[in-house]
Amino acid sequence: MSKITEEVETIITPILDELNFELVEVEYTKEGKDHFLRISIDKEGGVNLNDCTLASEKISEAMDENDPIPDMYYLDVASPGAERPIKKEKDYHNAIDKPVFVSLYAPIEGDKEWLGILKAVDDDTITMEVKEKAKTKQIEIPRNKIAKARHAVMI
Protein backbone atom coordinates (compact mmCIF):
# COMPACT_ATOMS: atom_id res chain seq x y z
CA MET A 1 0.00 0.00 0.00
CA SER A 2 1.37 3.41 -0.92
CA LYS A 3 1.70 6.36 1.42
CA ILE A 4 -1.07 8.17 -0.46
CA THR A 5 -3.57 5.32 -0.19
CA GLU A 6 -2.74 4.91 3.52
CA GLU A 7 -3.39 8.62 4.12
CA VAL A 8 -6.62 8.48 2.11
CA GLU A 9 -7.77 5.47 4.17
CA THR A 10 -7.08 7.39 7.38
CA ILE A 11 -9.17 10.33 6.15
CA ILE A 12 -12.14 8.41 4.75
CA THR A 13 -12.55 5.45 7.13
CA PRO A 14 -14.34 7.49 9.85
CA ILE A 15 -16.66 8.96 7.20
CA LEU A 16 -17.55 5.55 5.80
CA ASP A 17 -18.00 4.15 9.33
CA GLU A 18 -20.45 6.96 10.09
CA LEU A 19 -22.40 6.08 6.92
CA ASN A 20 -22.30 2.35 7.83
CA PHE A 21 -20.23 1.47 4.77
CA GLU A 22 -17.26 -0.88 4.70
CA LEU A 23 -14.09 0.30 2.97
CA VAL A 24 -13.09 -2.51 0.62
CA GLU A 25 -10.21 -0.95 -1.30
CA VAL A 26 -8.44 2.31 -2.07
CA GLU A 27 -6.51 2.51 -5.33
CA TYR A 28 -4.59 5.49 -6.71
CA THR A 29 -3.44 5.10 -10.30
CA LYS A 30 -2.21 7.07 -13.26
CA GLU A 31 -3.67 6.21 -16.65
CA GLY A 32 -2.19 8.23 -19.47
CA LYS A 33 -2.15 11.84 -18.28
CA ASP A 34 -4.97 11.35 -15.78
CA HIS A 35 -4.86 10.30 -12.12
CA PHE A 36 -7.69 8.30 -10.51
CA LEU A 37 -8.58 7.74 -6.87
CA ARG A 38 -10.83 4.68 -6.86
CA ILE A 39 -12.60 3.75 -3.66
CA SER A 40 -14.63 0.56 -3.34
CA ILE A 41 -17.30 0.43 -0.64
CA ASP A 42 -19.83 -2.14 0.49
CA LYS A 43 -22.47 -2.77 3.13
CA GLU A 44 -24.72 -5.60 4.21
CA GLY A 45 -26.98 -6.29 1.23
CA GLY A 46 -24.71 -4.37 -1.17
CA VAL A 47 -24.48 -0.72 -2.19
CA ASN A 48 -26.52 1.09 -4.82
CA LEU A 49 -25.97 4.23 -6.89
CA ASN A 50 -27.42 6.49 -4.17
CA ASP A 51 -25.02 5.00 -1.60
CA CYS A 52 -22.05 5.60 -3.89
CA THR A 53 -23.19 9.17 -4.60
CA LEU A 54 -23.60 9.95 -0.89
CA ALA A 55 -20.21 8.46 -0.03
CA SER A 56 -18.57 10.30 -2.94
CA GLU A 57 -19.96 13.65 -1.77
CA LYS A 58 -18.79 13.13 1.84
CA ILE A 59 -15.38 11.83 0.75
CA SER A 60 -14.94 14.73 -1.68
CA GLU A 61 -15.65 17.26 1.10
CA ALA A 62 -13.11 15.61 3.42
CA MET A 63 -10.49 15.33 0.70
CA ASP A 64 -10.90 19.03 -0.15
CA GLU A 65 -9.92 19.83 3.46
CA ASN A 66 -7.07 17.34 3.95
CA ASP A 67 -6.01 16.21 0.50
CA PRO A 68 -2.74 14.23 0.56
CA ILE A 69 -2.71 13.99 -3.24
CA PRO A 70 -0.68 16.73 -4.97
CA ASP A 71 -2.04 16.02 -8.47
CA MET A 72 -5.45 16.70 -9.99
CA TYR A 73 -7.42 13.44 -9.98
CA TYR A 74 -10.80 11.91 -10.65
CA LEU A 75 -12.63 10.47 -7.64
CA ASP A 76 -14.51 7.23 -8.34
CA VAL A 77 -16.57 5.62 -5.57
CA ALA A 78 -18.14 2.30 -6.51
CA SER A 79 -19.24 -1.14 -5.42
CA PRO A 80 -16.46 -3.74 -5.45
CA GLY A 81 -18.53 -5.86 -7.85
CA ALA A 82 -18.80 -9.62 -8.14
CA GLU A 83 -15.03 -10.06 -8.33
CA ARG A 84 -14.27 -8.05 -5.21
CA PRO A 85 -10.73 -8.24 -3.82
CA ILE A 86 -9.90 -10.48 -0.89
CA LYS A 87 -7.44 -8.64 1.34
CA LYS A 88 -8.45 -8.68 4.98
CA GLU A 89 -8.72 -11.68 7.27
CA LYS A 90 -12.50 -11.45 7.34
CA ASP A 91 -12.57 -11.32 3.51
CA TYR A 92 -10.83 -14.70 3.41
CA HIS A 93 -13.23 -16.22 5.94
CA ASN A 94 -16.26 -14.80 4.09
CA ALA A 95 -14.97 -16.42 0.88
CA ILE A 96 -14.86 -19.98 2.26
CA ASP A 97 -16.83 -22.36 -0.01
CA LYS A 98 -16.93 -19.71 -2.74
CA PRO A 99 -15.01 -19.46 -6.01
CA VAL A 100 -11.80 -17.44 -5.81
CA PHE A 101 -8.94 -16.48 -8.12
CA VAL A 102 -5.46 -16.29 -6.63
CA SER A 103 -2.37 -14.81 -8.28
CA LEU A 104 1.00 -15.74 -6.76
CA TYR A 105 4.43 -14.14 -6.56
CA ALA A 106 6.05 -17.47 -7.46
CA PRO A 107 4.65 -20.65 -9.02
CA ILE A 108 3.27 -23.53 -7.00
CA GLU A 109 3.10 -26.83 -8.87
CA GLY A 110 4.13 -24.91 -11.99
CA ASP A 111 1.33 -22.30 -11.92
CA LYS A 112 1.22 -18.70 -10.68
CA GLU A 113 -2.58 -18.42 -11.02
CA TRP A 114 -5.22 -20.64 -9.44
CA LEU A 115 -9.00 -20.67 -9.79
CA GLY A 116 -11.07 -22.82 -7.48
CA ILE A 117 -13.19 -23.06 -4.35
CA LEU A 118 -11.66 -21.73 -1.14
CA LYS A 119 -12.02 -24.53 1.40
CA ALA A 120 -10.01 -23.41 4.43
CA VAL A 121 -8.02 -20.49 5.82
CA ASP A 122 -5.53 -20.29 8.65
CA ASP A 123 -2.82 -17.85 9.69
CA ASP A 124 -0.26 -19.23 7.23
CA THR A 125 -2.10 -20.94 4.35
CA ILE A 126 -5.26 -21.19 2.34
CA THR A 127 -6.60 -24.45 0.95
CA MET A 128 -8.32 -24.45 -2.43
CA GLU A 129 -10.18 -27.15 -4.29
CA VAL A 130 -9.13 -26.91 -7.94
CA LYS A 131 -9.87 -28.86 -11.08
CA GLU A 132 -7.00 -30.39 -12.97
CA LYS A 133 -8.16 -32.03 -16.18
CA ALA A 134 -11.04 -34.29 -15.09
CA LYS A 135 -9.94 -34.54 -11.45
CA THR A 136 -10.51 -32.35 -8.43
CA LYS A 137 -7.68 -31.87 -5.96
CA GLN A 138 -6.83 -29.68 -3.00
CA ILE A 139 -3.78 -27.45 -2.89
CA GLU A 140 -2.35 -25.48 -0.01
CA ILE A 141 -1.02 -22.03 -0.78
CA PRO A 142 1.16 -20.13 1.71
CA ARG A 143 -0.45 -16.75 2.32
CA ASN A 144 2.90 -14.97 1.99
CA LYS A 145 3.07 -16.15 -1.65
CA ILE A 146 -0.28 -14.55 -2.58
CA ALA A 147 0.12 -11.40 -4.67
CA LYS A 148 -3.62 -10.86 -5.17
CA ALA A 149 -6.80 -12.72 -4.35
CA ARG A 150 -10.35 -11.97 -5.42
CA HIS A 151 -13.77 -13.53 -5.65
CA ALA A 152 -14.36 -15.22 -8.98
CA VAL A 153 -17.35 -15.91 -11.17
CA MET A 154 -17.28 -19.50 -12.38
CA ILE A 155 -19.57 -20.63 -15.17
UniProtKB/Swiss-Prot annotation:
It is found in: Cytoplasm. The keyword Cytoplasm applies. Keywords: Cytoplasm, Ribosome biogenesis. InterPro entries: Ribosome_maturation_RimP, RimP_C, RimP_C_sf, RimP_N, RimP_N_sf. Pfam families: DUF150_C (PF17384), RimP_N (PF02576). GO terms for biological process: ribosomal small subunit assembly; translation. One of its GO terms (cellular component) is cytosol. Its main location: cytoplasm. Disulfide bonds: none annotated. Required for maturation of 30S ribosomal subunits. Belongs to the RimP family. This is Ribosome maturation factor RimP.
